[in-house]
UniProtKB/Swiss-Prot annotation:
SUPFAM superfamilies hit by this protein: Protein kinase-like (PK-like)
Main function: Catalyzes the ATP-dependent phosphorylation of maltose to maltose 1-phosphate. Only maltose acts effectively as phosphoryl-group acceptor, but maltotriose, maltotetraose, maltopentaose, and maltohexaose show a weak potential to replace maltose. ATP is not replaceable as phosphoryl-group donor.
Record note on quaternary structure: Monomer.
Molecular function via GO: ATP binding; kinase activity
Gene name in the database record: mak1
Alphabetically ordered keywords of this record: ATP-binding, Carbohydrate metabolism, Glycogen biosynthesis, Glycogen metabolism, Kinase, Nucleotide-binding, Transferase
UniProt pathway: Glycan biosynthesis; glycogen biosynthesis
Pfam families tied to this protein: Mak_N_cap
Summary of pH dependence: Optimum pH is 8.5.
Protein known as: Maltokinase
Catalytic reactions on record: D-maltose + ATP = alpha-maltose 1-phosphate + ADP + H(+)
Presence of the UniProt keyword Ubl conjugation in the record: no
Length: 437
């Protein structure tokens, strides 16, 4: 069985090789999961020497739902059968959920249901269209199956930390319901996970930007007077993040570590080489980091890539999602303990983005810039107050360290924006100016 993956893969939104030239595509394995359903692992090599492994659930039956026929149809195999992406076939995804429910084994693939959970086997599945790097299938209002498109062997931190937090009863994550993995000579390889679905939820980024937009729309009102004031939600978000940190510390432990001076200085050098606008700040940034030579930090497992787009507000609570860590980093590095200040800094940076991204075309408007700063300061303070209420320690009391983690994040952002959104580069540069000033 050979399908034309070389033509189909580059058209998928989760394909990560668009900036590289494809050299070869070959099927590494095909595991039958049913009469007309195979789990296929596809190895991709690029001309620059890099490689990736992708996961595709291939269906051979009547085909996907008609509205998805274009994106899901892979093509005709060498045996004459037509293959398609089975995640767009409700019968196939219901079958996958059933395999999780029975903790089934198929070849080298194992499915595992979490203890004491019930899966919505009769629910109607639909693909979540907004997903980028993975593909998720929602089962009514009850569960969501996330299939990892790029397969990397090792313990997946998203599954690992959701399992720890769920079994500990932390209320600020969507409970893990099950998972699936394969095994090869390198060890276990996580393939997907099933969690509770956060029905009737709103993304933190959307809520925050709406609040800032409301403030800018009424030139006479203060941040605490507009209808979309976000301060209370920021306080509760701080409490939620601190709660997750506390549970992870209790369940997985903490320890001392030196401030990662070499790593942050290396990121500065790399970013400055790619972003000319950053070079004038390098001496001041370097001095800020080198002032922490010999500093010791308390490290533990953390989210690792926390920002307002990684949190959901349900009617009951804030939820933290996507514990996969910083994208692009090796799996073992994403599982390394880090300072909780890394997550705090990520949220604080995100407040600046929520406000200032609305002003990228009006950067010379001093009045709007002042109102943006008012909104940012108000919500940063509320978040830290909420965090302190649960953690028992104020992250602002570690001012030099917290600023260093913010600065490290802003340097990363500058490199990202210069490459992908040059019009937004002024946002991290504004923050760097403030942090080193």
């Amino acid at each position: 069985m050979t399908l034309p993956f070389a033509e189909w893969l580059p058209k998928q939104r989760w394909y990560a090789g668009r900036s590289r030239v494809l050299a070869s595509v070959k099927e590494a394995s095909a595991t039958p999961l049913g009469e007309e359903l195979d789990l296929v692992l596809v190895d991709v090599e690029y001309t620059d020497g890099s490689s990736e492994r992708y996961q595709v659930m291939v269906g051979w039956g009547d085909g996907p739902l008609p509205e998805y026929s274009t994106i899901a149809s892979i093509g005709t195999a060498d045996d004459g059968r037509d293959g398609y992406d089975a995640l767009y076939d409700p019968r196939a995804t219901r079958h996958l959920l059933g395999l999780v429910d029975t903790s089934a084994t198929a070849g080298d693939v194992t499915f595992e249901k979490e203890p004491g959970v019930e899966l919505p086997l009769e629910a109607w599945p639909r693909v979540f269209d907004a997903e980028q790097s993975n593909t998720s299938v929602i089962f009514d209002e009850d569960a969501i199956l996330k299939l990892f498109r790029r397969v990397t062997c090792g313990v997946n931190p998203d599954i690992e930390l959701n399992r720890v937090l769920g079994r500990a009863g932390n209320p600020h994550v969507a409970r893990l319901l099950g998972s699936l993995q394969s095994a090869d000579d390198s060890g276990p390889c996580s393939l997907g996970m099933v969690t509770e679905y956060a029905a009737n939820s709103a993304e933190g980024w959307a809520m925050a930007t709406a609040s800032a937009r409301d403030l800018f729309a009424d030139a006479e009102m203060r941040a605490d007077e507009v209808g979309g004031d976000f301060q209370g939600e920021s306080y509760r978000l701080g409490e939620a993040v601190a709660s997750v940190h506390r549970t992870l510390a209790e369940e997985l432990g903490t320890g001392p570590a030196p401030f990662p001076l070499d790593a942050v200085l290396a990121r500065v050098r790399t970013a400055a080489a790619a972003v000319p606008e950053l070079q004038q700040f390098v001496p001041a940034i370097t001095a800020r980091f080198e002032a922490l030579t010999g500093a010791e930090v308390v490290v533990q497992r953390v989210h690792g890539d926390l920002h307002l787009g990684q949190v959901l507000r349900t009617p009951e609570a804030w939820l933290l999602i996507d514990f996969e860590g910083e994208p692009g980093q090796p799996l073992d590095e994403r599982r390394m303990p880090d300072s909780p200040l890394r997550d705090v800094a990520g949220v604080l940076r995100s407040y600046e983005y929520a406000a200032y991204q609305l002003l990228v075309d009006q950067d010379d408007d001093e009045h709007l810039a002042a109102r943006a700063r008012e909104w940012v300061d108000r919500n940063r303070a509320a978040f830290c107050d909420g965090y302190t209420n649960v953690a028992g320690a104020d992250p602002r009391e570690q001012g030099a360290l917290l600023s260093a983690y913010e600065l490290d994040k802003a340097v990363y952002e500058a490199a990202y924006e210069a490459r992908h959104r040059p019009g937004w580069l002024r946002i991290p540069l504004r923050s760097i100016t403030r942090l080193v000033g």
